[in-house]
């Protein structure tokens, strides 16, 4: 068998984990692009997202982001609209949590978009009846 003369394996090719993108410039949408919130992941590099204009689109994650940038339900993404297919789009960029908060503060995202959708931080809102907490009055306690 020939002797190994290489300079390492796949760990060398992977390189050091340098945090270059921790402070990146905020990218705003251009014409032909739209902000969207991922509703669910479909697999095979696809996801379903609801755009800011109210349209539900099937989004394709581009190859540059595939297996490098992990997208989950509830994430805010920038999608490129297709001029020949209105119900499909391509994911261009995933916004980090702080970038999404900045977009909402700048007024780019409407108030109806809920950030951190998977996490209910402040509990159920007024009017939601799916709570397990029941509050009794003093006279109700005496009857029990």
Swiss-Prot record:
UniProt entry keywords in alphabetical sequence: Initiation factor, Protein biosynthesis
Biased composition (Basic residues): 1-15
Chain intervals for the UniProt region annotation (Disordered): 1-25, 120-144
Start-end of Basic and acidic residues biased regions: 16-25
InterPro entries: NA-bd_OB-fold (IPR012340), RNA-binding_domain_S1_IF1 (IPR006196), TIF_eIF-1A (IPR001253), TIF_eIF-1A_CS (IPR018104)
Molecular-function annotations in GO: RNA binding; translation initiation factor activity
GO cellular component: cytoplasm
Effect of residue 113 to L: Could be a sequencing error
GO biological process, one term: translational initiation
Sequence ranges assigned to domain S1-like in this UniProt record: 22-96
PANTHER family the record matches: EIF-1A
Family to which this protein belongs: Belongs to the eIF-1A family.
Function: Seems to be required for maximal rate of protein biosynthesis. Enhances ribosome dissociation into subunits and stabilizes the binding of the initiator Met-tRNA(I) to 40 S ribosomal subunits.
Annotated protein name in UniProt: Eukaryotic translation initiation factor 1A
């Amino acid at each position: 068998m020939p002797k190994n003369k290489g300079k390492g394996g796949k760990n060398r090719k992977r390189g050091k984990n340098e945090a270059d993108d921790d402070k990146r410039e905020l990218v705003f949408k251009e014409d032909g692009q739209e902000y969207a919130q991922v509703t669910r992941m479909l697999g095979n590099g696809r996801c379903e997202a609801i755009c800011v204009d109210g349209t539900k689109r099937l989004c394709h994650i581009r190859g540059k982001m595939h297996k490098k940038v992990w997208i989950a339900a509830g994430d805010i993404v920038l999608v490129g609209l297709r001029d020949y297919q209105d119900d499909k789009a391509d994911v261009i960029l995933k916004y980090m949590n702080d970038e999404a908060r900045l977009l909402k503060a700048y007024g780019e995202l409407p108030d109806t978009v809920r950030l951190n959708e998977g996490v209910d931080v402040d509990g159920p809102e007024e009017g939601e009846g799916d709570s397990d907490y029941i509050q009794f009055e003093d006279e109700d306690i005496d009857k029990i």
